[in-house]
């Protein structure tokens, strides 16, 4: 369920302040953040934000298409290693018996 429109988007105050400060100075550094729930505002476009996924910080370059989404959507927290495929690794299934 989306957030109410009368409340407005949730943007981490410290993160927004750092981005606005970098915009005024014209810098482009990687910003580390643990705030996955923060919404991406148009001020973030062009910056690289390292979003924590529970283990490491994943660098996310913010483009125009990402505005309105949350930072956590672009830093997956789970790694998929595939299903147990013992037969597939050995070269196929066992031959059928008649």
Curated annotation (Swiss-Prot):
Stored Gene3D superfamilies: 30s Ribosomal Protein S19, Chain A
What are the GO MF terms of this UniProt record? rRNA binding; structural constituent of ribosome
SUPFAM superfamilies reported for this sequence: Ribosomal protein S19 (SSF54570)
Pfam families given for it? Ribosomal_S19
Bridged cysteine pairs (disulfide): none
PROSITE patterns xrefs:
RIBOSOMAL_S19
Cellular-component GO terms for this entry: cytoplasm; small ribosomal subunit
Instruction: Please tell me whether the keyword rRNA-binding is annotated for this protein.
Output: yes
Spell out the InterPro entries in the cross-references. Answer: Ribosomal_uS19 (IPR002222), Ribosomal_uS19_bac-type (IPR005732), Ribosomal_uS19_CS (IPR020934), Ribosomal_uS19_SF (IPR023575)
Keyword Membrane annotated: no
What keywords were assigned to this record?
Ribonucleoprotein, Ribosomal protein, RNA-binding, rRNA-binding
Residues of the region (Disordered) are 77-98
> What are the recorded Gene Ontology BP terms?
ribosomal small subunit assembly; translation
HAMAP family of this UniProt entry?
Ribosomal_uS19 (MF_00531)
Q: Which family does it belong to?
A: Belongs to the universal ribosomal protein uS19 family.
Extract the PANTHER family matched here.
RIBOSOMAL PROTEIN S19P FAMILY MEMBER (PTHR11880), SMALL RIBOSOMAL SUBUNIT PROTEIN US19M (PTHR11880:SF8)
Q: What does this chain do?
A: Protein S19 forms a complex with S13 that binds strongly to the 16S ribosomal RNA.
The name of this protein is Small ribosomal subunit protein uS19
Q: Which organism is it from?
A: Chlorobium phaeovibrioides (strain DSM 265 / 1930)
This protein's gene is called rpsS
